[in-house]
Regions:
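Long, charged/polar, soluble alpha-helical segments
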Residues: 25-176
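Bacterial N-terminal signal peptides that target proteins for export
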Residues: 1-12, 16-20
Length: 176
């Protein structure tokens, strides 16, 4: 009887050991502001330049959707949630792009094209956000989230500028 109990216990531990990695993989954290397709694109992009540009594309998309929602004449009961959700998604994309810059710097990857793209597009994002802060419709609904988005964009621009200054110059190729 005792040996049967021991065998049963070992069998259950074996099954639990096989199932545990699958359960952990199923609970892998996903960024709730990225769709499955977008998350796959980020995962598939191996180059930090590509990943940063993808995050900037997704941020631009969220900002465009936010502007579209603002322009819509709608009396939705959850309008505030939609607007704040889009701004939070924008901020998450910009923050992730800034995080990718930091990671690429640590790995000493050449991300100059992505940094220049971040500076150019980030300034445009910031101008749009500042314009909304001055005279955006229904500002009281999303004021705090808008302030966070502007702060995140400014921080990302500072990170990009700092990274561009700290990055070693590209190697000079000499003619043979």
């Amino acid at each position: 009887m005792r040996s049967h109990l021991v065998r049963c216990l070992f069998f259950m531990m074996f099954v639990a050991g096989l199932c545990a990695p699958r359960a952990a993989r199923a609970q892998a954290p996903t960024r709730d502001y990225l769709s499955e397709v977008e998350a796959d694109k980020i995962r598939d992009a191996q180059d930090p330049n590509d990943r940063i540009k993808l995050f900037l594309d997704f941020a631009a998309d969220r900002l465009k959707k936010f502007q579209y929602e603002l322009g819509r004449a709608s009396s939705q009961s959850h309008r505030a949630e939609v607007l704040n959700g889009l701004l939070n998604a924008y901020t998450g994309c910009v923050d992730d792009a800034a995080d990718m810059i930091t990671l690429a710097q640590e790995k000493q990857a050449d991300i100059r094209p992505a940094l220049k793209d971040m500076q150019a597009r980030g300034k445009g994002f910031l101008e749009t956000l500042e314009k909304l802060a001055k005279d955006g419709p229904e500002l009281e609904i999303y004021r705090d989230t808008l302030d966070d988005a502007m702060d995140g964009t400014r921080d990302a621009l500072k990170d990009a500028e700092k990274a561009l200054k700290e990055m070693a110059p590209p190697p000079v190729r000499r003619k043979p």
